[in-house]
Amino acid sequence: MAMRTIVIRVAAGAALVLATLANNANAQIASPILNAVEVQKLVASADPVDNARLSAHFAALAERYAREATRHDAMAQAVIASPIRRTPANTAADHCKRLAGLNTQAANTLRELAAYHEKRAAGAVASVPKGVAPFHAGTGAPEPSDDELSALAARASTPADHHALEEYFQTAAKRYREAVNEHSSMAQAYRGTRIAQAAVHCDRLVSLSRDEAKEATAAAEMHKQLATAGR
C-alpha cells in the first residue's frame, strides 16, 4: 500500500513538472506579432505599454521580412546554378532578387519603426520614420480571428477601439466593392454564350456584394462618429 502511494505521488509530481514545462514552453514561443486590428488600435495610443507591444511587433515583423529576403536571395542563386531551367534563368533570378530587395527594404523600415515605438515607450521624443503608414495600418500583420473581432466589438468603448473597428469595416467595404466589379465582369462575359444562365447567378452576387459594401460602409461611419465623440 505504501509503495502504491509513493508511485502515485511520483506520477503526480512528474505530471506537474511536465505541465509546468509545457506552460513555460508556450510562454517562450508566444509570438509578439499582433493582428491588424490590434495594430491599428495601439498606434493611436500614447501609453508606454502599448508602444512597447508595437515595438516588439514591428521588430518581429522585421525579422520575418529579413528571413524572406535571405530565402529569395538563395532562390535566385539556385535558379542561376540549376542545370535544368524551364524559365529564362536571368528573368527568374531577377524576380527573386527584386523580391529580396523589397523584403530588405521593408525589414529596414520595420526596424526603424520598432526603434521609434521603443523610444515612445520610454517616454522619449521621437519622429515618425518615413514610409511607415502601411505598417501602421496593419500591413504584414495577420487578420484578426472571428473570436478576436467579436471580443473587440463587444467591449469597444474608447476612441482607439472604435477607430480600429472603423478601419476594419472600411477594409471590408473595399473588399466587397472589388467583389462587385469582379462579379459584374463575369456576368458580362457569360452573356451571349451557351451558358448565359450563369450571368443570372453573377448578377445575384453583384447585388449581394453591393449590399454588403453598403452595410460595411455604414458600420465604418458609425464607428468613426463614435471615435470622434469619445475624444
What residue ranges belong to the model's regions?
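Amphipathic alpha-helical coiled-coil segments
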Residues: 96-124, 176, 208-231
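Bacterial N-terminal signal peptides
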Residues: 9-21
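Non-transmembrane amphipathic alpha-helical segments
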Residues: 51, 55-58, 62-65, 69-80, ...
